[in-house]
Amino acid sequence: MHSSLETTAPATLERRESNLGDKLILKGLKFYGFHGAIAEERTLGQMFLVDIDAWVSLKKAGESDNLEDTISYVDIFSLAKEIVEGSPRNLLETVAELIASKTLEKFHQINAVRVKLSKPNVALIKSTIDYLGVDIFRQRNTSSKN
């Protein structure tokens, strides 16, 4: 049986990401939110883990040693915190998409963003797991002129 789906090997994804250049990395962000498809998740809440990679040229900041020439990690952290701790959503996909789209919208210097969003405690699974989550990559549309 043949599938019409194409897959990309992890090594190919890593090469594609490395072609994007420099990146800011925020790893292991922890927030408490009320997202989930079942009522208990939306009323009791739970911990969410977030990793964000933001591709942006760091050359000018590296040469100038001036915060004005880069994007503050605190600003990206604050945006993610506001979304995860904000209005409840049914799906992790929606929360990750909001983080990615708002990051690209707010920080015009960022060319692409990768958001990994996970929850280590899943109410529907009565077994030990590290986490369940989503990993999305969004790239700025370079064909449109603003």
Curated annotation (Swiss-Prot):
SUPFAM superfamilies: Tetrahydrobiopterin biosynthesis enzymes-like. It catalyses: 7,8-dihydroneopterin = 6-hydroxymethyl-7,8-dihydropterin + glycolaldehyde. SMART domains: FolB (SM00905). Keywords: Folate biosynthesis, Lyase. GO terms for molecular function: dihydroneopterin aldolase activity. It comes from the Eukaryota. NCBIfam families: folB (TIGR00525), folB_dom (TIGR00526). Belongs to the DHNA family. Catalyzes the conversion of 7,8-dihydroneopterin into 6-hydroxymethyl-7,8-dihydropterin, a biosynthetic precursor of the vitamin tetrahydrofolate. Can use L-threo-dihydroneopterin and D-erythro-dihydroneopterin as substrates for the formation of 6-hydroxymethyldihydropterin, but it can also catalyze the epimerization of carbon 2' of dihydroneopterin and dihydromonapterin. This is Dihydroneopterin aldolase 1. The lineage of its organism: Eukaryota, Viridiplantae, Streptophyta, Embryophyta, Tracheophyta. The gene is FOLB1.
